[in-house]
């Protein structure tokens, strides 16, 4: 009985401590966050009003129009 109670307690704590994951954006290359890390840049905004943080290598390159 004590083992069952201990197991349930541990499972409850683990479910509360582990994050459910962050929402993905920009073709699954970015993550919706309140703040971006130093190696990431904001390119668009997510549906939940958070910033879509994307590493620069996954952002599209700007092309100049040719006339």
Curated annotation (Swiss-Prot):
Disulfide bonds: 25-52, 32-46, 36-53
Entry protein name: Beta-defensin 123
Entry GO CC: extracellular region
Top-level lineage group: Eukaryota
InterPro entries from the UniProt entry: Beta-defensin, Beta_defensin_dom
Name of the encoding gene: DEFB123
Keywords in alphabetical order: Antibiotic, Antimicrobial, Defensin, Disulfide bond, Secreted, Signal
Primary subcellular site in the record, as a coarse category: secreted
Family membership noted in the UniProt record: Belongs to the beta-defensin family.
Signal sequence, start to end: 1-20
GO terms, biological process: defense response to Gram-negative bacterium; innate immune response
Gene3D superfamilies: Antimicrobial Peptide, Beta-defensin 2, Chain A (3.10.360.10)
Role description: Has antibacterial activity.
Pfam families on file: Defensin_beta_2
Subcellular location field: Secreted
Species of origin: Pongo pygmaeus (Bornean orangutan)
